[in-house]
């Protein structure tokens, strides 16, 4: 796995050198402290603060995990944070970063990092819920060890699409396919959440690998709590700007050719599960898959 990770990094670097100016990546995140945009939600004593709140650590033990959420709710924008995952034997643990509305027919945009035994790679699972319906899981390996250094995980969300980024590499696109009968998150403001919790009933090898509590506490580290979105906590209609925000501009309404090459690189080398190609689960391919170039 180490050799594959090394060559994966070299290939990505070559792509960047060849076409470094072509990709319309989101604006550079602004490094702000935790307390500017976020508050703890549970198990406050399992969150530690460093450097005036510019860095935090979440801790999981056999009694509880912990988590936090944004102060505001947002309708469209760019949201990111840098995370260093639980090192060592992290089997059974899940570190989650996601956006979600607060109702029964909720919308949700998920990053879930599934821990593994020492020496085995993390799995990144993404999912999109619209109108309370999810079941759009995709899983990838990463081309680096996410426990060694901080890496950026971000979401760009506008009226046209949702893009999941890992260090500015697009790993998934979910386009607005309302014309195909697929609901899209466009009118329910979402809060931003993150949590570290035990999910050993499903997270690692379908629940076969259980959390080894002798390795606790499990610690995930965070920094760079970037939020650049339309805060809709008071008036959602204010955010229906019809193209006036930077994230609505033409260059952010689709990936360009360079970004699609990077997405195909992730698809071909690191994807281990894609609901779009699961014919046992979906004998008829979901209508959004072809538009999202997930096949």
UniProtKB/Swiss-Prot annotation:
Q: Which superkingdom heads the taxonomic lineage of this protein's source?
A: Eukaryota
Report the induction information: In fruits, expression is greatly decreased by gibberellic acid (GA3) on day 12 of storage and by 1-methylcyclopropene (1-MCP) until day 12 of storage. Expression in fruits is also decreased by low (0 degrees Celsius) temperature treatment throughout the storage.
What does the entry report about post-translational modification of this chain? Answer: Contains at least one intrachain disulfide bond essential for its enzymatic activity.
Q: What disulfide bonds does the UniProt entry report for this chain?
A: 230-239, 276-289
Site positions per UniProt: Important for catalytic activity:
110
* A Pfam family: Glyco_hydro_16
Spell out the molecular function terms from Gene Ontology: hydrolase activity, hydrolyzing O-glycosyl compounds; xyloglucan:xyloglucosyl transferase activity
State where it is primarily located: secreted
GO CC terms, sorted: apoplast
> Which keywords fit this entry according to its UniProt record?
Apoplast, Cell wall, Cell wall biogenesis/degradation, Disulfide bond, Fruit ripening, Glycoprotein, Glycosidase, Glycosyltransferase, Hydrolase, Secreted, Signal, Transferase
**PANTHER family cross-referenced by the UniProt entry:** XYLOGLUCAN ENDOTRANSGLUCOSYLASE/HYDROLASE PROTEIN 8-RELATED
Q: What is this protein called?
A: Xyloglucan endotransglucosylase protein 2
Organism of this sequence: Diospyros kaki
Q: Which gene encodes it?
A: XTH2
